[in-house]
């Protein structure tokens, strides 16, 4: 679960949680500012059990010996199942108190460990056929469609639980261009 804040955490701090394990600890120096676009990536090494959070292609937080990673089920799920969600925290999908108050441009799911260099280089663009890329949603489908197509061709299309809102005219600043 990648989320903003929690009980005892600043509201603008990203936090990664698996079961009862959370990282990083509360830290006002790691706040994300409202109204700004950020590229966020989290990697998990199944061999070393290390999890790393990157913000704008730079390592922001790291934790070693972070539990036992399990595969994410991207398949269509029934209400009541542990569900993979984008823009909504855990719990019942009808509970709108746990949804993200913000916008998401893209989401990618990999089954290979990405290096900091790869994350930085591909912050804004990646070939959908790249080895290990299991799902890739751009969230630019347009009006009236509640399905975000999986660009990898793996069939992991994302279906909105409620009516999708497709903002227009979003320009995401490319922070990795020198």
Show the residue positions of the predicted features.
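Extracellular glycan-associated modules
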Residues: 1-156, 161-178
């Amino acid at each position: 679960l990648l989320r903003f804040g929690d009980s005892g955490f600043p509201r603008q701090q990203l936090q990664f949680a698996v079961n009862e394990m959370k990282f990083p600890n509360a830290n006002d120096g790691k706040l994300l500012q409202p109204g700004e676009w950020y590229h966020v990536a989290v990697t998990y090494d199944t061999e070393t059990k290390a999890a790393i959070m990157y913000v704008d292609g730079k390592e922001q937080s790291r934790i070693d010996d972070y539990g036992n990673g399990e595969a994410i089920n991207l398949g269509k799920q029934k209400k009541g199942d542990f569900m993979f969600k984008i823009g909504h925290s855990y719990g019942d999908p009808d509970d709108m108190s746990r949804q993200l108050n913000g916008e998401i441009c893209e989401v990618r799911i990999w089954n290979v460990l990405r290096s900091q260099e790869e994350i930085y280089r591909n912050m804004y663009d990646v070939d959908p056929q790249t080895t290990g890329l299991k799902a890739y949603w751009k969230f630019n489908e347009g009006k009236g469609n509640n399905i975000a197509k999986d660009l990898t061709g793996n069939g992991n299309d994302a279906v909105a639980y409620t009516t999708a809102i497709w903002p227009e005219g979003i320009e995401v600043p490319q922070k990795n261009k020198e």
